[in-house]
Amino acid sequence: MKKKIGLICEGGGTKAAYTCGVLQCFLDENINFPYTVGISAGAEVLVAFVSKQRERLKVAGVDAASNPKAIGLYPLLKERGVFGIQYVCKFIEELAPLDYQTFMENETELDIGLYNMDNDEVEYYGKEYLDPQEQILVQASCALFLLTRPYKWNGHTYMDAGLVDMIPIEQSIRKGMDKHIFISTKEENYVRKPAPSWQLRLSSLFYPGKKNVFAMRIIIANGEL
């Protein structure tokens, strides 16, 4: 019996360049998967993988990540956040427009993880939810904690699912995959250090009145953020 193998990509910001290199090799060798799932930058690059666009992987993982307008004062003025996810998505589209037809016709399934701030749950949406023009689904998945503003979409407030589910292997299991290939953006033997207390204070300041603040307290206290 043929095993069903899921491909899992975590976030990692600019370190997703390494993920892009692996995905390019998969494309070069015609290695396909029935199911893929990603969060944050992992979701962004999986869009390029499912659309079979080698150049888009390079643009997303290297060119966009190294663009000086992606981080700092420019996005702070334009998007009210230190990381300019809207600018990055537009930059990628200008240099390597999404081949939406190939993306949708590819039999590979793609789930993108978002953190719903209203109910403290991670929700996964298939590629059919991706608007090829706005791409709010990807932008919301890449909305980094404390660095970008949350996104309103589908009647709820969303941000980077890495707050809760850094490695979405459980979603791959739920989708019936027998085995899983995980592309990590962390070095071998990586152990996350406890987060500093200032993140707890900033979370209360940045996200006042949200039901998820208590959940964030637990996440930060456990050093999982």
Task: Enumerate the language-model features and the residues they cover.
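Patatin-like phospholipase
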Residues: M1-I39, V47-L225
